[in-house]
Protein backbone atom coordinates (compact mmCIF):
# COMPACT_ATOMS: atom_id res chain seq x y z
CA UNK A 1 0.00 0.00 0.00
CA UNK A 2 2.99 2.31 0.46
CA UNK A 3 2.94 3.52 -3.16
CA UNK A 4 -0.84 3.53 -3.53
CA UNK A 5 -2.87 6.60 -2.72
CA UNK A 6 -5.90 4.71 -1.43
CA UNK A 7 -6.85 2.12 1.16
CA UNK A 8 -9.81 -0.19 0.65
CA UNK A 9 -10.73 -3.68 1.80
CA UNK A 10 -10.20 -5.51 -1.50
CA UNK A 11 -9.36 -3.83 -4.80
CA UNK A 12 -10.40 -7.00 -6.67
CA UNK A 13 -14.03 -6.07 -5.94
CA UNK A 14 -13.75 -3.17 -8.39
CA UNK A 15 -15.43 -4.89 -11.36
CA UNK A 16 -18.44 -5.83 -9.23
CA UNK A 17 -18.62 -2.31 -7.89
CA UNK A 18 -18.43 -0.81 -11.38
CA UNK A 19 -21.40 -2.93 -12.53
CA UNK A 20 -23.45 -1.71 -9.56
CA UNK A 21 -22.42 1.89 -10.23
CA UNK A 22 -23.71 1.56 -13.80
CA UNK A 23 -27.08 0.36 -12.50
CA UNK A 24 -27.20 3.21 -9.98
CA UNK A 25 -26.49 5.79 -12.69
CA UNK A 26 -29.73 4.83 -14.43
CA UNK A 27 -31.59 5.58 -11.18
CA UNK A 28 -29.83 8.88 -10.47
CA UNK A 29 -31.14 11.27 -13.14
CA UNK A 30 -30.33 14.42 -11.18
CA UNK A 31 -26.62 13.68 -11.05
CA UNK A 32 -26.42 12.41 -14.62
CA UNK A 33 -28.25 15.42 -16.02
CA UNK A 34 -26.02 17.73 -13.98
CA UNK A 35 -23.02 16.08 -15.64
CA UNK A 36 -24.51 16.64 -19.08
CA UNK A 37 -25.36 20.27 -18.33
CA UNK A 38 -22.06 21.34 -16.80
CA UNK A 39 -19.34 18.89 -17.93
CA UNK A 40 -18.15 21.09 -20.80
CA UNK A 41 -17.87 24.16 -18.55
CA UNK A 42 -15.97 22.34 -15.77
CA UNK A 43 -17.33 24.68 -13.05
CA UNK A 44 -15.34 22.83 -10.38
CA UNK A 45 -12.00 22.98 -12.19
CA UNK A 46 -9.40 23.78 -9.55
CA UNK A 47 -11.61 22.60 -6.68
CA UNK A 48 -9.87 20.19 -4.32
CA UNK A 49 -12.66 18.50 -2.40
CA UNK A 50 -12.15 16.51 0.79
CA UNK A 51 -15.25 14.37 1.22
CA UNK A 52 -16.45 12.48 4.29
CA UNK A 53 -19.69 10.70 3.45
CA UNK A 54 -20.85 7.06 3.44
CA UNK A 55 -18.78 5.29 0.74
CA UNK A 56 -21.66 3.56 -1.03
CA UNK A 57 -22.48 2.83 -4.65
CA UNK A 58 -24.57 6.00 -4.77
CA UNK A 59 -21.71 8.04 -3.34
CA UNK A 60 -19.49 6.69 -6.11
CA UNK A 61 -21.85 8.33 -8.62
CA UNK A 62 -21.59 11.59 -6.64
CA UNK A 63 -17.78 11.43 -6.56
CA UNK A 64 -17.56 10.80 -10.29
CA UNK A 65 -20.01 13.63 -10.98
CA UNK A 66 -17.80 16.04 -9.03
CA UNK A 67 -14.83 14.81 -11.05
CA UNK A 68 -16.71 15.19 -14.34
CA UNK A 69 -17.25 18.82 -13.39
CA UNK A 70 -13.52 19.32 -12.92
CA UNK A 71 -12.86 18.67 -9.22
CA UNK A 72 -10.06 16.70 -7.60
CA UNK A 73 -11.50 14.52 -4.84
CA UNK A 74 -10.18 12.62 -1.81
CA UNK A 75 -12.72 10.60 0.15
CA UNK A 76 -13.43 8.80 3.42
CA UNK A 77 -16.60 7.36 4.91
CA UNK A 78 -18.42 9.10 7.75
CA UNK A 79 -19.32 5.83 9.49
CA UNK A 80 -17.18 2.80 10.34
CA UNK A 81 -19.78 0.32 9.09
CA UNK A 82 -21.36 2.09 6.11
CA UNK A 83 -18.84 1.49 3.34
CA UNK A 84 -19.76 -0.87 0.52
CA UNK A 85 -16.37 -2.38 -0.19
CA UNK A 86 -17.12 -2.97 -3.86
CA UNK A 87 -17.98 0.73 -4.28
CA UNK A 88 -14.76 1.84 -2.59
CA UNK A 89 -12.76 -0.56 -4.76
CA UNK A 90 -14.37 0.65 -7.99
CA UNK A 91 -13.70 4.29 -7.17
CA UNK A 92 -10.11 3.55 -6.10
CA UNK A 93 -9.46 1.50 -9.24
CA UNK A 94 -10.66 4.49 -11.26
CA UNK A 95 -7.88 6.60 -9.76
CA UNK A 96 -9.66 8.32 -6.87
CA UNK A 97 -7.87 8.43 -3.51
CA UNK A 98 -10.46 6.76 -1.27
CA UNK A 99 -9.83 5.59 2.27
CA UNK A 100 -12.78 3.51 3.44
CA UNK A 101 -13.72 -0.06 4.26
CA UNK A 102 -16.56 -1.70 6.16
CA UNK A 103 -15.65 -2.41 9.76
CA UNK A 104 -13.04 0.26 10.47
CA UNK A 105 -11.88 0.75 14.04
CA UNK A 106 -12.35 4.19 15.58
CA UNK A 107 -8.62 4.83 15.17
CA UNK A 108 -8.74 3.81 11.51
CA UNK A 109 -11.78 6.02 10.97
CA UNK A 110 -9.90 9.14 12.04
CA UNK A 111 -6.82 8.04 10.08
CA UNK A 112 -8.95 7.81 6.93
CA UNK A 113 -10.25 11.36 7.42
CA UNK A 114 -6.66 12.52 7.89
CA UNK A 115 -5.70 11.07 4.49
CA UNK A 116 -8.32 13.21 2.77
CA UNK A 117 -6.85 16.37 4.30
CA UNK A 118 -3.17 15.72 3.61
CA UNK A 119 -2.46 14.32 0.16
CA UNK A 120 0.81 13.74 -1.69
CA UNK A 121 2.88 16.64 -3.02
CA UNK A 122 1.35 19.06 -0.54
CA UNK A 123 -2.25 18.46 -1.64
CA UNK A 124 -4.70 20.30 0.65
CA UNK A 125 -8.46 20.74 0.23
CA UNK A 126 -10.06 24.03 -0.71
CA UNK A 127 -13.61 22.61 -0.40
CA UNK A 128 -15.25 20.28 2.13
CA UNK A 129 -18.19 17.94 1.61
CA UNK A 130 -19.30 16.48 4.93
CA UNK A 131 -21.88 14.19 6.48
CA UNK A 132 -22.20 14.50 10.24
CA UNK A 133 -19.58 17.18 10.76
CA UNK A 134 -16.51 15.14 11.72
CA UNK A 135 -14.37 16.35 8.80
CA UNK A 136 -15.42 19.94 9.48
CA UNK A 137 -14.56 19.53 13.16
CA UNK A 138 -11.10 18.09 12.40
CA UNK A 139 -10.30 21.03 10.11
CA UNK A 140 -11.43 23.56 12.74
CA UNK A 141 -9.68 21.87 15.66
CA UNK A 142 -6.46 20.58 14.08
CA UNK A 143 -5.94 22.66 10.93
CA UNK A 144 -7.21 26.18 11.66
CA UNK A 145 -4.57 27.71 9.38
CA UNK A 146 -6.01 25.75 6.45
CA UNK A 147 -9.41 27.45 6.69
CA UNK A 148 -8.30 30.66 4.98
CA UNK A 149 -7.93 28.67 1.75
CA UNK A 150 -11.22 26.76 2.02
CA UNK A 151 -14.14 28.23 0.09
CA UNK A 152 -16.71 26.43 2.25
CA UNK A 153 -18.40 23.21 3.30
CA UNK A 154 -21.64 21.57 2.24
CA UNK A 155 -23.20 19.42 4.99
CA UNK A 156 -25.46 16.46 4.28
CA UNK A 157 -27.27 15.50 7.45
CA UNK A 158 -29.35 16.81 10.34
CA UNK A 159 -26.70 16.09 12.97
CA UNK A 160 -23.94 17.83 11.05
CA UNK A 161 -26.15 20.83 10.36
CA UNK A 162 -26.89 21.13 14.08
CA UNK A 163 -23.16 21.21 14.76
CA UNK A 164 -22.69 23.95 12.12
CA UNK A 165 -25.41 26.15 13.61
CA UNK A 166 -23.88 25.69 17.07
CA UNK A 167 -20.47 26.74 15.76
CA UNK A 168 -22.03 29.74 14.02
CA UNK A 169 -23.93 30.75 17.16
CA UNK A 170 -20.70 30.67 19.18
CA UNK A 171 -18.76 32.58 16.51
CA UNK A 172 -16.53 29.56 15.88
CA UNK A 173 -17.43 28.76 12.26
CA UNK A 174 -14.37 29.40 10.14
CA UNK A 175 -15.90 29.18 6.65
CA UNK A 176 -19.20 29.57 4.79
CA UNK A 177 -21.41 26.49 5.05
CA UNK A 178 -24.32 25.19 3.03
CA UNK A 179 -26.99 23.29 4.91
CA UNK A 180 -27.89 20.73 2.25
CA UNK A 181 -30.02 18.76 4.71
CA UNK A 182 -32.75 21.39 4.81
CA UNK A 183 -33.19 21.61 1.08
CA UNK A 184 -36.74 20.34 0.63
CA UNK A 185 -35.55 17.84 -1.97
CA UNK A 186 -33.21 16.39 0.65
CA UNK A 187 -35.01 16.36 4.00
CA UNK A 188 -38.49 15.60 2.66
CA UNK A 189 -37.19 12.88 0.36
CA UNK A 190 -33.97 11.27 1.62
CA UNK A 191 -34.93 11.53 5.30
CA UNK A 192 -38.55 10.45 4.82
CA UNK A 193 -38.89 8.30 1.70
CA UNK A 194 -35.36 6.93 1.95
CA UNK A 195 -35.83 5.76 5.53
CA UNK A 196 -39.25 4.40 4.63
CA UNK A 197 -37.54 1.86 2.39
CA UNK A 198 -34.14 1.28 3.98
CA UNK A 199 -35.15 0.78 7.63
CA UNK A 200 -37.24 -2.34 7.15
CA UNK A 201 -34.76 -3.61 4.57
CA UNK A 202 -32.02 -3.51 7.20
CA UNK A 203 -34.11 -5.08 9.99
CA UNK A 204 -35.18 -7.88 7.64
CA UNK A 205 -31.65 -8.56 6.39
CA UNK A 206 -30.30 -8.57 9.93
CA UNK A 207 -32.94 -10.66 11.69
CA UNK A 208 -35.41 -12.20 9.20
CA UNK A 209 -38.05 -11.34 11.79
CA UNK A 210 -41.75 -11.11 10.95
CA UNK A 211 -42.68 -7.47 11.51
CA UNK A 212 -46.45 -7.90 11.18
CA UNK A 213 -48.12 -8.09 14.56
CA UNK A 214 -45.10 -6.81 16.47
CA UNK A 215 -45.12 -3.66 18.59
CA UNK A 216 -42.48 -1.31 17.19
CA UNK A 217 -41.35 1.89 18.88
CA UNK A 218 -39.90 4.80 16.91
CA UNK A 219 -38.13 7.38 19.06
CA UNK A 220 -38.47 10.74 17.33
CA UNK A 221 -41.07 11.84 14.77
CA UNK A 222 -39.07 14.16 12.55
CA UNK A 223 -38.71 13.33 8.88
CA UNK A 224 -36.60 10.24 9.60
CA UNK A 225 -39.00 9.08 12.30
CA UNK A 226 -42.00 9.67 10.05
CA UNK A 227 -40.51 7.53 7.29
CA UNK A 228 -39.50 4.83 9.76
CA UNK A 229 -42.95 4.70 11.33
CA UNK A 230 -44.63 4.47 7.92
CA UNK A 231 -42.41 1.58 6.88
CA UNK A 232 -43.06 -0.45 10.02
CA UNK A 233 -46.81 0.19 9.86
CA UNK A 234 -46.78 -0.77 6.18
CA UNK A 235 -45.61 -4.25 7.15
CA UNK A 236 -48.29 -4.61 9.80
CA UNK A 237 -46.57 -3.55 13.01
CA UNK A 238 -48.36 -1.68 15.77
CA UNK A 239 -46.25 1.48 15.83
CA UNK A 240 -45.74 3.59 18.92
CA UNK A 241 -43.85 6.89 18.94
CA UNK A 242 -41.90 8.70 21.65
CA UNK A 243 -41.47 12.46 21.31
CA UNK A 244 -40.38 15.51 23.32
CA UNK A 245 -41.86 18.05 20.88
CA UNK A 246 -45.62 18.59 21.31
CA UNK A 247 -46.05 19.47 17.63
CA UNK A 248 -44.40 16.27 16.43
CA UNK A 249 -46.26 14.29 19.09
CA UNK A 250 -49.57 15.71 17.86
CA UNK A 251 -48.62 14.90 14.27
CA UNK A 252 -47.92 11.31 15.29
CA UNK A 253 -51.25 11.09 17.09
CA UNK A 254 -53.13 12.50 14.10
CA UNK A 255 -51.39 9.95 11.87
CA UNK A 256 -52.77 7.21 14.08
CA UNK A 257 -49.70 6.32 16.12
CA UNK A 258 -49.79 5.84 19.87
CA UNK A 259 -47.54 8.37 21.60
CA UNK A 260 -45.91 6.95 24.72
CA UNK A 261 -42.81 7.37 26.85
CA UNK A 262 -39.88 4.99 26.50
CA UNK A 263 -40.53 3.90 30.08
CA UNK A 264 -44.00 2.75 29.03
CA UNK A 265 -42.78 1.09 25.86
CA UNK A 266 -39.66 -0.69 27.09
CA UNK A 267 -41.30 -3.72 28.77
CA UNK A 268 -43.87 -4.19 25.99
CA UNK A 269 -42.42 -3.53 22.54
CA UNK A 270 -40.62 -5.97 20.27
CA UNK A 271 -38.66 -3.57 18.04
CA UNK A 272 -37.02 -0.27 19.02
CA UNK A 273 -35.74 2.32 16.53
CA UNK A 274 -34.09 5.61 17.53
CA UNK A 275 -34.34 8.56 15.13
CA UNK A 276 -33.82 11.64 17.27
CA UNK A 277 -30.33 13.08 16.78
CA UNK A 278 -30.05 13.16 20.57
CA UNK A 279 -28.17 10.88 22.96
CA UNK A 280 -29.16 8.32 25.63
CA UNK A 281 -32.65 8.10 24.16
CA UNK A 282 -32.63 4.41 25.04
CA UNK A 283 -30.85 4.08 28.38
CA UNK A 284 -29.41 1.12 30.23
CA UNK A 285 -32.51 0.99 32.43
CA UNK A 286 -34.76 0.91 29.36
CA UNK A 287 -32.84 -2.06 27.96
CA UNK A 288 -32.90 -3.86 31.30
CA UNK A 289 -36.70 -3.56 31.20
CA UNK A 290 -37.05 -4.93 27.66
CA UNK A 291 -38.39 -8.34 26.72
CA UNK A 292 -36.14 -11.23 25.83
CA UNK A 293 -35.05 -11.01 22.17
CA UNK A 294 -36.19 -7.40 21.74
CA UNK A 295 -34.58 -5.86 18.66
CA UNK A 296 -32.81 -2.53 19.26
CA UNK A 297 -31.43 -0.31 16.50
CA UNK A 298 -30.69 3.27 15.51
CA UNK A 299 -31.25 5.18 12.27
CA UNK A 300 -29.85 8.50 13.52
CA UNK A 301 -26.34 9.58 12.54
CA UNK A 302 -24.32 8.83 15.68
CA UNK A 303 -24.12 5.71 17.86
CA UNK A 304 -24.96 7.39 21.17
CA UNK A 305 -28.76 7.48 20.81
CA UNK A 306 -28.64 4.05 22.46
CA UNK A 307 -26.46 3.72 25.55
CA UNK A 308 -24.34 0.99 24.00
CA UNK A 309 -21.38 1.80 26.24
CA UNK A 310 -23.31 0.55 29.28
CA UNK A 311 -23.73 -2.84 27.60
CA UNK A 312 -19.99 -3.50 27.33
CA UNK A 313 -20.03 -5.04 30.82
CA UNK A 314 -22.23 -7.89 29.59
CA UNK A 315 -21.65 -10.93 27.41
CA UNK A 316 -21.85 -10.25 23.66
CA UNK A 317 -22.45 -13.04 21.16
CA UNK A 318 -22.03 -12.11 17.50
CA UNK A 319 -24.76 -13.83 15.48
CA UNK A 320 -23.35 -12.44 12.23
CA UNK A 321 -21.62 -9.17 11.30
CA UNK A 322 -23.52 -6.20 12.80
CA UNK A 323 -25.98 -8.46 14.67
CA UNK A 324 -25.20 -9.14 18.34
CA UNK A 325 -26.97 -10.81 21.22
CA UNK A 326 -26.26 -8.92 24.44
CA UNK A 327 -26.98 -11.10 27.47
CA UNK A 328 -27.98 -9.55 30.78
CA UNK A 329 -27.13 -11.17 34.15
CA UNK A 330 -30.63 -12.68 34.42
CA UNK A 331 -30.12 -14.53 31.11
CA UNK A 332 -32.32 -12.22 29.04
CA UNK A 333 -30.93 -11.21 25.65
CA UNK A 334 -31.56 -8.24 23.41
CA UNK A 335 -30.62 -8.20 19.73
CA UNK A 336 -28.53 -5.11 18.99
CA UNK A 337 -28.07 -4.14 15.35
CA UNK A 338 -24.95 -2.42 13.94
CA UNK A 339 -23.66 -1.78 17.48
CA UNK A 340 -26.14 1.09 17.71
CA UNK A 341 -24.81 2.85 14.61
CA UNK A 342 -26.81 3.61 11.46
CA UNK A 343 -28.73 0.39 10.93
CA UNK A 344 -29.69 0.97 7.31
CA UNK A 345 -26.03 1.26 6.31
CA UNK A 346 -24.60 -1.20 8.82
CA UNK A 347 -27.05 -4.03 8.12
CA UNK A 348 -28.08 -3.12 4.55
CA UNK A 349 -26.92 -0.79 1.78
CA UNK A 350 -28.67 2.44 2.75
CA UNK A 351 -31.26 4.37 0.77
CA UNK A 352 -32.18 3.55 -2.84
CA UNK A 353 -30.25 5.30 -5.61
CA UNK A 354 -33.17 7.40 -6.82
CA UNK A 355 -33.76 9.23 -3.56
CA UNK A 356 -30.01 9.69 -3.04
CA UNK A 357 -29.88 11.38 -6.43
CA UNK A 358 -32.05 14.13 -4.93
CA UNK A 359 -29.70 14.62 -1.98
CA UNK A 360 -26.49 14.41 -3.96
CA UNK A 361 -27.66 16.75 -6.71
CA UNK A 362 -28.15 19.31 -3.93
CA UNK A 363 -24.60 18.61 -2.79
CA UNK A 364 -23.23 19.27 -6.27
CA UNK A 365 -25.27 22.49 -6.54
CA UNK A 366 -23.92 23.64 -3.17
CA UNK A 367 -20.33 22.84 -4.11
CA UNK A 368 -20.66 24.81 -7.37
CA UNK A 369 -22.31 27.75 -5.62
CA UNK A 370 -19.58 28.00 -2.97
CA UNK A 371 -16.65 27.46 -5.30
CA UNK A 372 -17.80 29.85 -8.01
CA UNK A 373 -18.74 32.69 -5.67
CA UNK A 374 -15.77 33.36 -3.39
CA UNK A 375 -16.45 36.22 -1.03
CA UNK A 376 -20.21 36.13 -1.61
CA UNK A 377 -20.93 34.28 1.62
CA UNK A 378 -19.97 35.16 5.18
CA UNK A 379 -18.81 32.59 7.74
CA UNK A 380 -22.36 31.47 8.41
CA UNK A 381 -24.82 28.72 7.46
CA UNK A 382 -26.95 29.03 4.30
CA UNK A 383 -29.54 26.97 2.46
CA UNK A 384 -29.77 26.63 -1.31
CA UNK A 385 -32.21 29.06 -2.94
CA UNK A 386 -35.70 27.86 -3.80
CA UNK A 387 -35.16 27.86 -7.57
CA UNK A 388 -32.35 25.30 -7.20
CA UNK A 389 -34.49 23.15 -4.91
CA UNK A 390 -37.21 23.16 -7.57
CA UNK A 391 -34.65 22.40 -10.27
CA UNK A 392 -33.46 19.31 -8.38
CA UNK A 393 -37.04 18.07 -8.17
CA UNK A 394 -37.70 18.78 -11.85
CA UNK A 395 -34.65 16.74 -12.88
CA UNK A 396 -36.24 13.65 -11.30
CA UNK A 397 -39.80 13.90 -12.60
CA UNK A 398 -39.19 12.17 -15.92
CA UNK A 399 -37.83 9.05 -14.24
CA UNK A 400 -41.15 8.56 -12.42
CA UNK A 401 -43.34 9.49 -15.39
CA UNK A 402 -44.58 12.76 -13.90
CA UNK A 403 -45.78 15.57 -16.18
CA UNK A 404 -45.93 19.10 -14.77
CA UNK A 405 -48.83 21.43 -15.42
CA UNK A 406 -47.67 24.87 -16.59
CA UNK A 407 -49.23 28.04 -15.24
CA UNK A 408 -50.62 30.59 -17.66
CA UNK A 409 -49.30 34.15 -17.34
CA UNK A 410 -52.64 35.13 -15.84
CA UNK A 411 -52.56 32.33 -13.26
CA UNK A 412 -48.97 33.15 -12.32
CA UNK A 413 -49.86 36.81 -11.91
CA UNK A 414 -52.87 35.93 -9.78
CA UNK A 415 -50.72 34.16 -7.17
CA UNK A 416 -47.72 36.44 -7.61
CA UNK A 417 -45.12 34.05 -9.03
CA UNK A 418 -43.22 33.59 -12.28
CA UNK A 419 -44.44 30.92 -14.69
CA UNK A 420 -40.96 29.39 -14.30
CA UNK A 421 -40.97 29.52 -10.49
CA UNK A 422 -40.06 29.61 -7.72
CA UNK A 423 -43.61 28.57 -6.90
CA UNK A 424 -43.46 28.81 -3.12
CA UNK A 425 -42.05 31.37 -0.66
CA UNK A 426 -38.94 30.45 1.32
CA UNK A 427 -40.98 29.86 4.47
CA UNK A 428 -43.37 27.34 2.88
CA UNK A 429 -43.08 24.05 4.77
CA UNK A 430 -44.29 21.43 2.23
Curated annotation (Swiss-Prot):
Matches recorded under InterPro entries: Adenosylhomocyst_ase-like_sf, Adenosylhomocysteinase-like, Ado_hCys_hydrolase_NAD-bd, NAD(P)-bd_dom_sf, S-Ado-L-homoCys_hydrolase_CS
Listed pathway(s): Amino-acid biosynthesis; L-homocysteine biosynthesis; L-homocysteine from S-adenosyl-L-homocysteine: step 1/1
Pfam families: AdoHcyase, AdoHcyase_NAD
NAD listed as a keyword: yes
Binding site for NAD(+): 157-159, 191, 220-225, 243, 278, 299-301, 344
Main location: cytoplasm
Cofactor: NAD(+)
Record EC number: 3.13.2.1
Cofactor note: Binds 1 NAD(+) per subunit.
Protein name, entry field: Adenosylhomocysteinase
Underlying gene: ahcY
